[in-house]
Amino acid sequence: MLLLLAEYLQQFHKGFAVFQYLTLRGILGVLTALCLSLFLGPWMIRTLQNLQIGQSVRNDGPQSHLSKSGTPTMGGALILSSIGISTLLWADLHNRYVWVVLLVTLLFGAIGWVDDYRKVIEKNSKGLPSRWKYFWQSVFGVGAAIFLYTTAPSAVETTLIIPMLKDASIPLGIGFVVLTYFVIVGSSNAVNLTDGLDGLAIMPTVMVGGALGIFCYLSGNVKFAEYLLIPYVPGAGELIVFCGALIGAGLGFLWFNTYPAQVFMGDVGALALGAALGTIAVIVRQEIVLFIMGGVFVMETLSVVIQVASFKLTGRRVFRMAPIHHHFELKGWPEPRVIVRFWIITVILVLVGLATLKLR
């Protein structure tokens, strides 16, 4: 929006041409979303408290969590609104990738909002029934996949890239739709499973989102893409504005979500942010790198799968409680220790993911 204004004002002063630079608009995206979330955060927390939109806590979980009961939830709306406003202000609104990622994020956020609403407002402990949750996730995930597949200008945009191997790729054809569906929906649910401790999900999301922003910038520049032997995806660089907004909104939310949390993001935030990460990774053809950098999300998801499978097959539990962050809590780890150690793991994995740019 402001980019269009800057383009118009260039005829009066050439200095407005500076807004054409992706790096500047990416930084402005960070700062705008950060300021919005910090400014609106206290108001949103008070509003949620006045509406008595508080988190309910399971009695069979760690006893330390009982004190969290009643903490305002659905704070993910703060993240999404900050991301949305910042992206609309600074991104090129003629770019199809911007709209794909933004719409997927908001649509998955809508699923989470309905789930949270039923849990908190209607006092329905099950929230949105799983079959309906996965149905709408599938509808939106497949819809995004089909759009990206049918509008892909070149075969490279539907090819699976194998990192760390020179010229290693697998043409997917229509299989691209299937892979994209699993990446988007899987990422959405993985972040949601991780969102169980104060700040546990948001900081890894910020770090992975920032790294994906780097991939977007490099993939959208033909010279960098050729030098680094990564797919050149025209227009992908514009997503650095969205990634910047995600970073700013995430850090602003962390200001209020850090231990002990004043607000939780709820499904409205977790489902949306996970879907955003998955969609961006698909666009820049870095699904495997996302799997590496989002190792904490993968670990949390696998712990649930293993726990459920083991209990159904043998009647025994592998972990004291799943997702695995609760297992460590029940082993006696203080909540801040679990959180920070998972952050450290994410830092390491993000660095490994970025290293794949040069490891061939």
From Swiss-Prot:
InterPro entries on file: Glycosyl_transferase_4, PNAcMuramoyl-5peptid_Trfase, PNAcMuramoyl-5peptid_Trfase_CS
Localization (cell): Cell inner membrane
One GO process term, biological-process aspect: regulation of cell shape
Alphabetical list of PROSITE patterns matching this protein: MRAY_1, MRAY_2
Bilayer disposition of the protein: Multi-pass membrane protein
Record's keyword annotation contains Cell inner membrane: yes
GO MF annotation terms: metal ion binding; phospho-N-acetylmuramoyl-pentapeptide-transferase activity; UDP-N-acetylmuramoyl-L-alanyl-D-glutamyl-meso-2,6-diaminopimelyl-D-alanyl-D-alanine:undecaprenyl-phosphate transferase activity
Entry's transmembrane regions: 25-45, 73-93, 97-117, 142-162, 168-188, 199-219, 236-256, 263-283, 288-308, 338-358
Enzyme Commission number, as recorded: 2.7.8.13
Top-level EC class as recorded in UniProt: transferase
Coiled coil: none
Record GO cellular component, one term: plasma membrane
Keyword tags: Cell cycle, Cell division, Cell inner membrane, Cell membrane, Cell shape, Cell wall biogenesis/degradation, Magnesium, Membrane, Metal-binding, Peptidoglycan synthesis, Transferase, Transmembrane, Transmembrane helix
Family in the record: Belongs to the glycosyltransferase 4 family. MraY subfamily.
This protein's name: Phospho-N-acetylmuramoyl-pentapeptide-transferase
Originating species: Pseudomonas fluorescens (strain SBW25)
